[in-house]
């Protein structure tokens, strides 16, 4: 796995390997430990939609891994002057950015991946399609409390427009748990 764009693309073993890797960064007291494994890597977070928790979580994670975090302020970028996202990514790749975390209202990440092979992409959320990092976090939360293969899980809410719900379902489809869905009819038409 080179990019993380959707949990649909991951096998059960790949998900478990990612969760095991994440668990290795939690110390015996439950705190996240710093381990500067990548001091020569540059990470840019491009968030074309508002975000607090996801954006800051990725910044903290990159910092904990020793990465150089490139501040990308959408409002002062050339995107505001009409530059395309493809051109922005092309320029960042030429600046030797190693990893791009992208949040966008549309499904554009695969087009950008096809454009450059020098940068790794992680989806920080795409429209109502996917949010793989949040899906992995939710699966990890279940795993810390229950067996992923033998749980009963109830999901309540707006299931038609939730990228988090979709990613959780995509990831959990690899496991043998019973998932029950619930919500107002007008918010669960597509389920």
Enumerate the language-model features and the residues they cover.
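Short, acidic/turn-prone active-site loops that include or flank metal/cofactor-
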Residues: 74-77, 125-130, 184-186
């Amino acid at each position: 796995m080179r990019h993380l764009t959707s949990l649909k693309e991951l096998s059960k073993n790949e998900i478990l390997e990612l969760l095991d890797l994440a668990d290795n960064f939690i110390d015996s007291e439950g705190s996240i430990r710093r381990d500067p494994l990548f001091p020569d890597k540059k990470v840019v977070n491009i968030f074309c939609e508002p975000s607090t928790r996801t954006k800051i979580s990725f910044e903290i994670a990159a910092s904990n891994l020793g990465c150089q975090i490139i501040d990308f302020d959408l409002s002062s970028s050339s995107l505001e002057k009409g530059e395309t996202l493809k051109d922005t990514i092309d320029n960042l790749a030429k600046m030797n950015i190693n990893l791009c975390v992208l949040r966008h209202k549309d499904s554009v990440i695969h087009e950008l991946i096809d454009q450059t092979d020098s940068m790794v992409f992680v989806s920080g959320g795409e429209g109502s399609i996917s949010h793989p990092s949040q899906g992995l976090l939710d699966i990890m939360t279940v795993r810390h409390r229950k067996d992923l293969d033998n749980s009963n899980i109830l999901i309540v809410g707006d299931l038609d427009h939730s990228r988090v719900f979709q990613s959780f379902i995509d990831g959990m489809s690899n496991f043998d748990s019973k998932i029950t869905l619930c919500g107002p009819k007008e918010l669960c038409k597509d389920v």
